[in-house]
Protein backbone atom coordinates (compact mmCIF):
# COMPACT_ATOMS: atom_id res chain seq x y z
CA UNK A 1 0.00 0.00 0.00
CA UNK A 2 2.77 2.41 0.99
CA UNK A 3 4.77 1.54 -2.12
CA UNK A 4 1.73 2.22 -4.28
CA UNK A 5 1.17 5.62 -2.65
CA UNK A 6 4.83 6.57 -3.10
CA UNK A 7 4.73 5.52 -6.74
CA UNK A 8 1.59 7.58 -7.35
CA UNK A 9 3.21 10.58 -5.68
CA UNK A 10 6.30 10.28 -7.85
CA UNK A 11 4.19 10.05 -10.98
CA UNK A 12 2.12 13.06 -10.01
CA UNK A 13 5.01 15.28 -8.98
CA UNK A 14 7.78 14.34 -11.40
CA UNK A 15 5.82 13.46 -14.54
CA UNK A 16 7.54 10.08 -14.85
CA UNK A 17 4.42 8.43 -16.24
CA UNK A 18 5.19 8.08 -19.91
CA UNK A 19 2.54 7.62 -22.55
CA UNK A 20 3.82 4.09 -23.08
CA UNK A 21 3.27 3.29 -19.39
CA UNK A 22 -0.28 4.60 -19.53
CA UNK A 23 -0.95 2.61 -22.68
CA UNK A 24 0.37 -0.55 -21.03
CA UNK A 25 -1.74 0.01 -17.93
CA UNK A 26 -4.95 0.52 -19.88
CA UNK A 27 -4.25 -2.48 -22.10
CA UNK A 28 -3.57 -4.76 -19.13
CA UNK A 29 -6.75 -3.66 -17.38
CA UNK A 30 -8.84 -4.34 -20.47
CA UNK A 31 -7.19 -7.68 -21.25
CA UNK A 32 -7.33 -8.94 -17.66
CA UNK A 33 -11.13 -8.97 -17.63
CA UNK A 34 -11.87 -12.59 -18.54
CA UNK A 35 -15.38 -13.50 -19.78
CA UNK A 36 -17.86 -13.68 -16.88
CA UNK A 37 -21.53 -14.59 -16.57
CA UNK A 38 -23.73 -11.73 -17.73
CA UNK A 39 -24.78 -9.42 -14.93
CA UNK A 40 -26.33 -5.99 -14.88
CA UNK A 41 -22.99 -4.50 -13.89
CA UNK A 42 -21.00 -6.31 -16.59
CA UNK A 43 -23.61 -5.45 -19.21
CA UNK A 44 -23.34 -1.77 -18.30
CA UNK A 45 -19.56 -1.96 -18.62
CA UNK A 46 -19.82 -3.63 -22.02
CA UNK A 47 -22.19 -0.96 -23.32
CA UNK A 48 -19.93 1.74 -21.90
CA UNK A 49 -17.03 0.36 -23.96
CA UNK A 50 -19.16 0.18 -27.11
CA UNK A 51 -20.30 3.75 -26.52
CA UNK A 52 -16.74 4.96 -26.04
CA UNK A 53 -15.58 3.38 -29.29
CA UNK A 54 -18.60 4.80 -31.09
CA UNK A 55 -17.81 8.24 -29.73
CA UNK A 56 -14.35 7.95 -31.25
CA UNK A 57 -15.92 7.13 -34.62
CA UNK A 58 -18.11 10.21 -34.31
CA UNK A 59 -15.02 12.41 -34.09
CA UNK A 60 -14.68 15.81 -32.51
CA UNK A 61 -16.03 14.74 -29.10
CA UNK A 62 -12.58 13.69 -27.94
CA UNK A 63 -9.12 14.76 -29.00
CA UNK A 64 -7.57 11.89 -30.94
CA UNK A 65 -3.93 10.90 -30.68
CA UNK A 66 -1.62 8.47 -32.36
CA UNK A 67 0.98 6.16 -30.89
CA UNK A 68 3.40 4.59 -33.35
CA UNK A 69 2.87 0.93 -32.58
CA UNK A 70 5.86 -1.37 -32.20
CA UNK A 71 3.53 -4.06 -33.49
CA UNK A 72 3.18 -2.26 -36.81
CA UNK A 73 5.38 -4.09 -39.28
CA UNK A 74 5.14 -5.98 -42.51
CA UNK A 75 4.58 -9.72 -42.46
CA UNK A 76 6.35 -11.36 -45.40
CA UNK A 77 5.56 -8.28 -47.45
CA UNK A 78 1.91 -9.29 -47.79
CA UNK A 79 0.29 -7.64 -44.79
CA UNK A 80 0.82 -5.04 -42.09
CA UNK A 81 0.04 -5.67 -38.43
CA UNK A 82 -1.66 -2.46 -37.31
CA UNK A 83 -2.87 -3.85 -33.98
CA UNK A 84 -2.84 -7.36 -32.56
CA UNK A 85 -6.61 -7.18 -31.89
CA UNK A 86 -7.49 -7.14 -35.59
CA UNK A 87 -6.52 -9.10 -38.68
CA UNK A 88 -3.37 -7.69 -40.34
CA UNK A 89 -4.10 -5.29 -43.19
CA UNK A 90 -3.13 -6.63 -46.64
CA UNK A 91 -0.70 -4.40 -48.50
CA UNK A 92 -2.71 -5.03 -51.67
CA UNK A 93 -6.52 -5.16 -51.86
CA UNK A 94 -8.67 -6.04 -54.86
CA UNK A 95 -11.37 -8.39 -56.07
CA UNK A 96 -12.55 -10.97 -55.18
CA UNK A 97 -11.87 -10.22 -51.50
CA UNK A 98 -13.45 -6.78 -51.72
CA UNK A 99 -15.82 -5.32 -54.36
CA UNK A 100 -13.34 -2.76 -55.69
CA UNK A 101 -12.94 -1.31 -59.16
CA UNK A 102 -9.20 -1.97 -59.43
CA UNK A 103 -6.11 -3.08 -57.50
CA UNK A 104 -4.99 -0.87 -54.60
CA UNK A 105 -1.66 -0.63 -52.74
CA UNK A 106 -1.40 0.57 -49.16
CA UNK A 107 -0.24 4.15 -48.57
CA UNK A 108 -0.27 4.06 -44.79
CA UNK A 109 -2.04 2.70 -41.74
CA UNK A 110 -2.54 3.58 -38.11
CA UNK A 111 -4.89 3.71 -35.18
CA UNK A 112 -7.55 6.16 -34.12
CA UNK A 113 -7.43 6.50 -30.35
CA UNK A 114 -9.37 8.38 -27.71
CA UNK A 115 -6.89 10.44 -25.73
CA UNK A 116 -9.02 10.52 -22.57
CA UNK A 117 -8.08 6.90 -21.82
CA UNK A 118 -5.71 6.32 -24.72
CA UNK A 119 -8.41 3.92 -25.85
CA UNK A 120 -7.95 2.36 -29.29
CA UNK A 121 -11.09 2.67 -31.40
CA UNK A 122 -10.29 1.37 -34.86
CA UNK A 123 -7.49 0.59 -37.28
CA UNK A 124 -7.33 2.72 -40.42
CA UNK A 125 -5.68 1.98 -43.74
CA UNK A 126 -5.44 4.27 -46.76
CA UNK A 127 -4.83 2.71 -50.19
CA UNK A 128 -4.02 4.17 -53.61
CA UNK A 129 -4.96 2.68 -56.99
CA UNK A 130 -1.86 1.09 -58.48
CA UNK A 131 -2.66 2.52 -61.91
CA UNK A 132 -2.96 6.02 -60.45
CA UNK A 133 0.42 6.20 -58.71
CA UNK A 134 1.98 8.22 -61.57
CA UNK A 135 -0.54 10.98 -60.84
CA UNK A 136 1.27 11.76 -57.58
CA UNK A 137 4.40 12.85 -59.45
CA UNK A 138 2.35 14.62 -62.12
CA UNK A 139 0.68 16.80 -59.49
CA UNK A 140 3.61 17.40 -57.15
CA UNK A 141 6.19 17.86 -59.93
CA UNK A 142 4.25 20.62 -61.67
CA UNK A 143 6.05 23.95 -61.98
CA UNK A 144 3.29 25.76 -60.10
CA UNK A 145 3.30 23.39 -57.11
CA UNK A 146 7.08 23.15 -57.01
CA UNK A 147 7.70 26.90 -57.19
CA UNK A 148 4.99 28.05 -54.79
CA UNK A 149 4.54 25.32 -52.19
CA UNK A 150 7.11 22.53 -52.34
CA UNK A 151 10.72 23.21 -53.30
CA UNK A 152 11.48 25.94 -50.77
CA UNK A 153 14.79 24.47 -49.59
CA UNK A 154 17.39 24.20 -52.36
CA UNK A 155 19.58 22.02 -50.14
CA UNK A 156 16.97 19.26 -50.04
CA UNK A 157 15.78 16.90 -52.72
CA UNK A 158 12.37 17.30 -54.31
CA UNK A 159 11.09 14.22 -52.43
CA UNK A 160 12.33 15.64 -49.11
CA UNK A 161 10.62 18.95 -49.82
CA UNK A 162 7.39 17.14 -50.72
CA UNK A 163 7.47 15.37 -47.36
CA UNK A 164 8.08 18.67 -45.55
CA UNK A 165 5.16 20.28 -47.38
CA UNK A 166 2.88 17.33 -46.58
CA UNK A 167 3.83 17.67 -42.91
CA UNK A 168 2.83 21.33 -42.92
CA UNK A 169 -0.82 21.82 -41.84
CA UNK A 170 -1.53 24.57 -44.38
CA UNK A 171 0.55 23.39 -47.33
CA UNK A 172 -0.66 19.82 -46.96
CA UNK A 173 -4.22 21.04 -47.54
CA UNK A 174 -3.18 22.57 -50.85
CA UNK A 175 -1.14 19.57 -51.99
CA UNK A 176 -3.79 17.00 -51.11
CA UNK A 177 -6.64 19.09 -52.56
CA UNK A 178 -4.77 19.24 -55.87
CA UNK A 179 -4.05 15.52 -55.73
CA UNK A 180 -7.70 14.68 -55.08
CA UNK A 181 -8.71 16.97 -57.95
CA UNK A 182 -6.63 14.81 -60.32
CA UNK A 183 -9.33 12.08 -60.24
CA UNK A 184 -7.04 9.80 -58.26
CA UNK A 185 -8.66 6.67 -56.82
CA UNK A 186 -8.22 5.72 -53.17
CA UNK A 187 -9.72 3.46 -50.51
CA UNK A 188 -10.12 3.98 -46.77
CA UNK A 189 -10.42 0.76 -44.76
CA UNK A 190 -11.79 1.01 -41.20
CA UNK A 191 -11.59 -1.99 -38.88
CA UNK A 192 -13.00 -1.63 -35.34
CA UNK A 193 -10.68 -2.77 -32.55
CA UNK A 194 -13.68 -3.00 -30.21
CA UNK A 195 -17.34 -3.58 -31.04
CA UNK A 196 -18.82 -0.39 -32.45
CA UNK A 197 -22.16 1.02 -33.58
CA UNK A 198 -23.20 1.34 -37.22
CA UNK A 199 -25.23 4.42 -36.40
CA UNK A 200 -22.34 6.31 -34.86
CA UNK A 201 -19.95 5.02 -37.49
CA UNK A 202 -22.13 6.75 -40.06
CA UNK A 203 -22.34 9.88 -37.92
CA UNK A 204 -18.56 9.87 -37.56
CA UNK A 205 -18.01 9.82 -41.30
CA UNK A 206 -20.46 12.68 -41.71
CA UNK A 207 -18.81 14.70 -38.96
CA UNK A 208 -15.34 14.21 -40.46
CA UNK A 209 -16.64 15.56 -43.77
CA UNK A 210 -18.25 18.53 -42.05
CA UNK A 211 -15.01 19.35 -40.21
CA UNK A 212 -13.22 20.15 -43.47
CA UNK A 213 -12.37 23.89 -43.45
CA UNK A 214 -14.22 24.49 -46.74
CA UNK A 215 -17.42 22.77 -45.60
CA UNK A 216 -18.98 26.01 -44.37
CA UNK A 217 -18.54 27.57 -47.82
CA UNK A 218 -20.54 24.81 -49.52
CA UNK A 219 -23.32 24.10 -47.03
CA UNK A 220 -26.16 23.57 -49.50
CA UNK A 221 -24.19 21.36 -51.87
CA UNK A 222 -22.68 19.39 -49.00
CA UNK A 223 -26.09 18.90 -47.39
CA UNK A 224 -27.22 16.97 -50.45
CA UNK A 225 -24.10 14.82 -50.21
CA UNK A 226 -24.67 14.15 -46.51
CA UNK A 227 -28.18 12.96 -47.31
CA UNK A 228 -26.66 10.54 -49.82
CA UNK A 229 -24.31 9.20 -47.12
CA UNK A 230 -27.24 8.54 -44.79
CA UNK A 231 -29.02 6.63 -47.54
CA UNK A 232 -25.94 4.76 -48.80
CA UNK A 233 -24.78 3.21 -45.52
CA UNK A 234 -27.51 0.64 -45.09
CA UNK A 235 -26.05 -1.43 -42.27
CA UNK A 236 -27.72 -1.22 -38.86
CA UNK A 237 -26.98 -2.38 -35.34
CA UNK A 238 -23.53 -3.29 -34.02
CA UNK A 239 -20.37 -3.38 -36.09
CA UNK A 240 -18.34 -6.24 -34.57
CA UNK A 241 -14.64 -5.82 -34.00
CA UNK A 242 -12.40 -6.95 -36.87
CA UNK A 243 -15.08 -6.43 -39.53
CA UNK A 244 -14.04 -4.18 -42.42
CA UNK A 245 -15.82 -1.05 -43.60
CA UNK A 246 -14.49 0.26 -46.92
CA UNK A 247 -14.94 3.56 -48.75
CA UNK A 248 -13.70 3.67 -52.34
CA UNK A 249 -13.09 7.07 -53.90
CA UNK A 250 -13.71 6.62 -57.63
CA UNK A 251 -12.31 8.59 -60.56
CA UNK A 252 -15.50 10.63 -60.97
CA UNK A 253 -15.36 11.71 -57.31
CA UNK A 254 -18.15 9.43 -56.13
CA UNK A 255 -17.71 7.43 -52.91
CA UNK A 256 -18.68 3.76 -52.83
CA UNK A 257 -19.31 1.92 -49.54
CA UNK A 258 -18.91 -1.79 -48.80
CA UNK A 259 -18.85 -3.92 -45.66
CA UNK A 260 -17.09 -7.21 -44.92
CA UNK A 261 -18.50 -9.45 -42.19
CA UNK A 262 -15.45 -11.47 -41.20
CA UNK A 263 -17.28 -14.01 -39.04
CA UNK A 264 -19.67 -14.94 -41.86
CA UNK A 265 -17.11 -14.27 -44.61
CA UNK A 266 -19.67 -12.19 -46.51
CA UNK A 267 -19.12 -8.95 -48.41
CA UNK A 268 -22.03 -6.53 -48.75
CA UNK A 269 -21.96 -3.79 -51.35
CA UNK A 270 -23.71 -0.79 -49.87
CA UNK A 271 -24.63 2.44 -51.62
CA UNK A 272 -22.71 5.13 -53.49
CA UNK A 273 -22.49 8.86 -52.81
CA UNK A 274 -22.32 10.79 -56.07
CA UNK A 275 -21.71 14.29 -54.67
CA UNK A 276 -17.90 14.62 -55.15
CA UNK A 277 -17.35 17.02 -52.24
CA UNK A 278 -18.10 14.23 -49.74
CA UNK A 279 -15.30 11.95 -50.89
CA UNK A 280 -12.87 14.80 -51.43
CA UNK A 281 -13.43 16.33 -48.01
CA UNK A 282 -13.29 12.95 -46.25
CA UNK A 283 -9.96 11.89 -47.77
CA UNK A 284 -8.57 15.38 -47.26
CA UNK A 285 -9.29 14.94 -43.55
CA UNK A 286 -7.37 11.65 -43.58
CA UNK A 287 -4.35 13.00 -45.45
CA UNK A 288 -3.90 16.66 -44.50
CA UNK A 289 -4.49 19.48 -42.04
CA UNK A 290 -3.58 20.16 -38.44
CA UNK A 291 -6.03 17.69 -36.91
CA UNK A 292 -6.23 14.60 -39.13
CA UNK A 293 -8.40 11.64 -38.19
CA UNK A 294 -5.29 9.56 -37.43
CA UNK A 295 -2.03 11.53 -37.33
CA UNK A 296 0.04 8.36 -37.62
CA UNK A 297 -1.80 7.26 -40.73
CA UNK A 298 -1.35 10.71 -42.26
CA UNK A 299 2.38 10.63 -41.52
CA UNK A 300 2.86 7.23 -43.14
CA UNK A 301 0.85 8.28 -46.18
CA UNK A 302 2.98 11.42 -46.50
CA UNK A 303 6.15 9.32 -46.49
CA UNK A 304 4.80 7.00 -49.18
CA UNK A 305 3.50 9.84 -51.35
CA UNK A 306 6.88 11.59 -51.15
CA UNK A 307 8.57 8.38 -52.30
CA UNK A 308 6.42 8.36 -55.45
CA UNK A 309 7.72 11.65 -56.89
Curated annotation (Swiss-Prot):
Major localization class: mitochondrion
Keyword Ubl conjugation included in the entry's annotation: no
PANTHER family: FATTY-ACID-BINDING PROTEIN 2
Localization in the cell: Mitochondrion
Name assigned to this protein: Altered inheritance of mitochondria protein 18, mitochondrial
Similarity-based family: Belongs to the AIM18/AIM46 family.
Pfam families named in the record: Chalcone_2
GO molecular function, one term: intramolecular lyase activity
InterPro entries: Chalcone_isomerase, Chalcone_isomerase_3-sand, Chalcone_isomerase_bundle_sf, Chalcone_isomerase_sf
Entry superkingdom: Eukaryota
Coiled-coil region list: none
Span of the transit peptide along the chain: 1-30
Cellular component terms per the entry's GO annotation: mitochondrial inner membrane
Species, as recorded: Candida glabrata (strain ATCC 2001 / BCRC 20586 / JCM 3761 / NBRC 0622 / NRRL Y-65 / CBS 138)
Keywords: Mitochondrion, Transit peptide
Key word Mitochondrion present: yes
Amino acid sequence: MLRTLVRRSLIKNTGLATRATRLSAVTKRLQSSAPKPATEKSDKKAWWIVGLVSAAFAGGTYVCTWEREELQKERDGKSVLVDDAVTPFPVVISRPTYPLSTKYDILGSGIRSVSVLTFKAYALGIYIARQDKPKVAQVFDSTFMSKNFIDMDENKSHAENVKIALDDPEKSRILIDNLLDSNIRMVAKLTPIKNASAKLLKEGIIKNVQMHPDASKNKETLAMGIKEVEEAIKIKGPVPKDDDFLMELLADGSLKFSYYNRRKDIVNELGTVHQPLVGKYLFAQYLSGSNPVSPGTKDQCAETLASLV
